C-alpha cells in the first residue's frame, strides 16, 4: 500500500484502495459490520409555489456496526489532495445522529481518529496509520464502557433486530429510540417515555423494541394498549405481523393466557362496572411489559379508567409512546413515565425530509370576528327564544349554529379543491358530530357532480357512525380514491395513518397544544408514489395562531390570510399570493407583528373545544338561518427559516440568499464567469432553496438564471436569452473561427436562446438537430475544433461572450 501513488486518486478510489483494506485487515466483517454510502436523512422538502423538490443530502461514507442496528463508528474519506482530517466535521455530524463516539477521517495517508471515550488527559483526536485501525472487539469494549453497560445487560442490548429480508432498516432516529429504550429497560428502568412526532414510525419502533425484549427472554408476556380500534388493527395487520401465532387481539372481554403478545383496546378490558374489568382475569404479575400507544390521552391521568389497568399491572415495565406528551395541572406524562429517553420532534422530521412541510391559508369570516347578536325576542328554527348576547367564534357550531356560516365554509373548501384537485384527500375537523353531519350535507350539496360519480365522495367519519367508520380504511388507503372528503370531530384526531391527505381543514375550536399537534400530524406523512410531498391547512377558527406558541416545534412554510371570495374567483390573485408570495419592498417591510391573540387563553387542556361525543346532547344549542355572513380583508404572511413571521416575496428570499454568498455584483459575475459549468452554480443555488420556475413566474420574463439573479438581486437591467444571443452576433465574434466551427457555434447560440445554458453545456447536444446533419459527434468536434479540448475552449469563450455585462457608470 505504501507504494501506491495516492495523489491522483478520487475519494471513491481512496475508499476502495486504502480504507476498505485497512478495515478488513483489522477484522471487520464486510457483510454484517460495514455499510457504505449510508443515507441518514431524506433531504428536506422545499416548497416554492406549486413545485416541491428535495434538498440533496450527503451520505456517510462508511458506518461500522457491532452488529446490524448497533452502530459504533463513522468514517469520512476525502481525495488525497485534501488534508487528512478534512472530513472530520462532517463525520462528527453523522456520529451525533447515530449517537456513536468514534469518528475516522482520512485522505488515504492514514486516519485522524476521534475517540469521545478517551479518558481525561488523553487526546480526543489523534493520527493513526492505516495498519493501526482498531478491531471490532477494541471499539466494542470502549463503546460498552462509554455507555456503562453491565454484563447482565449485554444479552438484551445485543439481541438482533427483526429482519424481514427486504433490506429495510430503521432510520437513524428510530435506531436511537429503539436502542435507548432497550438500554433503559435492560438497566431496570420500569417507566419509559418515548416522544416521536406523528408520522415518524412510532409503531414500527415499538415493534422492534418489543421484538428484541421478547426474543431475548427479558420480557415474556406483553400487552400493547391503544384506545382506537383502528390503531389496534393497523398494528396487528402491519408492523406486528411477524409475531404470528404468538399474538392475539383481545376480544370478548377475555384475556387468553395461551398467547404471549396481547393487543387490546382499553375499552375491551375495562369499564365502569366490575364485570367489565377483564384485566383482572389474570394475576397482577401476568404481564411483564406494557406498551401504551398515544399515552398522552389518559394513561398518565390519575383518575383515568385506563390508569387502573396500569396500576393493576404496576410491576410490569411500562413504555409510553406519544407525539405529544401532556403536561397540565391534572395530567403529566413525565410525572408518570419520567423524562423521555428520546425525543424526535416535528421540526426535526420536516428538516430531515421524513415529514411533509405545509402551507397555511387562514380564512376570516366577519361574524367570527365581529360577533352576531339576535334581535330582541328572536327565536331559532326550533322556536326557542335565543339568549340575548353577542355570539362569537367560540360559540359557533357549539352553542350557536348559523346555516349560512356552515355553507360558506363548505363552499370555500369546495372552491379550494376546484382550484387545486377535487380528488385530493381532505379531512374537515368539526366541533362535534352534529357539526360534522351538517358539514357533510353542505359539502354534498355543493359537489353534486362528484357525488353523482361516487356517493362516497363526502363521508362523515365519527365514532357514532358505523357506516362512516367502515370507510375509514378506504380513506387512508392510497390506492382507494373514495372517500375523498371526510368530516369528523374526534375520531380522526390521532393515530389515523392518512399518508395521502393533502388538505386539513380546521373549523374546530382548538386550544390544546396536544390536540393541535395531533391534528397537524394527519397531514405530515409523505407518500412520494402518490405525489404527496406537502400539504395545506385551511383554517377557519384561528387554530393556527398556536404556531406562535413557544411549545410548537414545527413552523409552517407559509401562512396566508384570505377570503372565500378570493378562493372562489378564478380571476383573483389568490393563487399567485399563495404560490408566489406577494411582493413587498425589502427595505420597507422586513416583518410584521403577530396578530392579536384570541380573547381566551391558550392552555394545554381541552376545557373549551370540540365536545366529547357522549356529551353533545347535554349542551343547549341554538340553530338559526337568514344571517348575512361575509368576509374581511386579507393579508399574506410567511414564516422564515428562523420561525419569525415576515412578509416576503420569493424575490426577497432569493435576494437574501444570494447576498449571503456574493455581497456584490462583481463577486457574483466573477464566480459565474470562472465556473467551468454554469449548471454547477445553478444546481448549488437550487440546494439553497431557489427554484427557478417560481422566480421566473415572479419576474415575468423569459430570463436566463444569470439575468434573473442580476436583475432581482443587484438591480441590473434584464436581458432575455434571445437578446443576449443577438448581442453576441452583433459583435461579429465568430469571425475568428473556421466556417465549420462558426456553424456549430451559431447553432449553439440558437440552442441557448431557446433552452438556456444548461442545454449547451451537455456534449450530447451535438447529437441533436440541426447538428446531426453536420456529422457524428466526434466528426463535428474534429472538423471544427481539432479535439475535445478545443471544443471546450470554444464553448467557454462563447459563454463569456453571452454573459458579457455592459459597462457600468462609476
From Swiss-Prot:
Pfam families: EcoEI_R_C (PF08463), Helicase_C (PF00271), HSDR_N (PF04313), ResIII (PF04851)
Coiled coil segments of this chain: none
Helicase C-terminal domain residues: 412-575
Start-end of Acidic residues biased regions: 578-588
EC id: 3.1.21.3
Subunit structure comment from the entry: The type I restriction/modification system is composed of three polypeptides R, M and S. The restriction enzyme has stoichiometry R(2)M(2)S(1) while the methyltransferase is M(2)S(1).
Name of the molecule in the record: Type I restriction enzyme EcoAI endonuclease subunit
Gene: hsdR
